[in-house]
């Protein structure tokens, strides 16, 4: 089923060697190795901003069409962000929501709303101008991790995979200053 595609897998019970995940919520019985520093940023298509205006404060997001993604363990429709005053939250709504990040990214490119998405995922769209970062002083920490169980701690294949992913992210994506 489609629901099965987006559930959290039982790595040990289902025979998975490695899980690559975004976010710092990792069960204590698992081993996690950071693959890359990452954060989620707010962005929108220039066409959306031209039609609806650019939010100037976090509170103004509540009046915008936001593209809400059901993330693993995050409250739906509540964006918790780090900003100039520390951690802040805003409740957001919009006509579109999904549990698939690529769908939300495409909606954002199509000018359907404001998106909170991982830097590595929207980096190219920001670089080529298809998306614009909004409220640049805000971000959500979301590092990228390789997660596995302790029986695989000395596995050569896991070590090679972790090294590959670290190099991949280091060569392609660096966070802005």
Task: Label each PLM-derived region with a short phrase.
Residues 1-2, 68, 89-100:
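Short beta-strand-to-loop elements that line the ligand-binding cleft
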Residues 32-35, 128-140:
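Short beta-strand->loop
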Residues 11, 61, 106-111, 126:
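Hydrophobic residues within well-ordered alpha-helices
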Residues 29-40, 44-69, 84:
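Flexible hinge/capping segments at coil-to-helix
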Residues 119-124, 128, 138-177:
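C-terminal effector-binding regulatory domain of bacterial HTH transcription factors
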Residues 77-91, 125:
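Ligand-binding cleft/hinge of the Venus flytrap
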Residues 1-28:
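Central regulatory/effector-binding core of bacterial HTH transcription factors
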Residues 13-21, 40, 109-114:
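Alpha-to-beta junction loops
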């Amino acid at each position: 089923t489609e629901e099965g595609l987006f559930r959290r897998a039982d790595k040990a019970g289902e025979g998975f060697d490695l899980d690559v995940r975004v976010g710092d919520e990792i069960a204590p019985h698992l081993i996690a190795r950071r693959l890359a520093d990452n954060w989620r940023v707010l962005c929108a298509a220039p066409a959306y901003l031209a039609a609806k205006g650019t939010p100037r404060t976090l509170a103004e997001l509540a009046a915008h069409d936001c593209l809400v993604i059901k993330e693993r363990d995050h409250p739906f429709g509540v964006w918790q962000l780090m900003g100039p005053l520390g951690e802040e939250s805003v409740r957001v709504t919009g006509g579109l929501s999904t549990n698939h990040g690529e769908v939300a990214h495409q909606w954002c490119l199509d000018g359907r709303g404001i998106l909170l998405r991982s830097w590595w995922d929207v980096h190219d769209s920001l670089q080529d101008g298809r998306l614009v970062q909004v409220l640049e002083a805000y971000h959500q920490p979301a590092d990228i991790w390789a997660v596995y169980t302790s029986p695989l701690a000395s596995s050569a294949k896991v070590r090679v995979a972790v090294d590959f992913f670290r190099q991949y992210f280091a060569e392609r994506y660096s966070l802005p200053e």
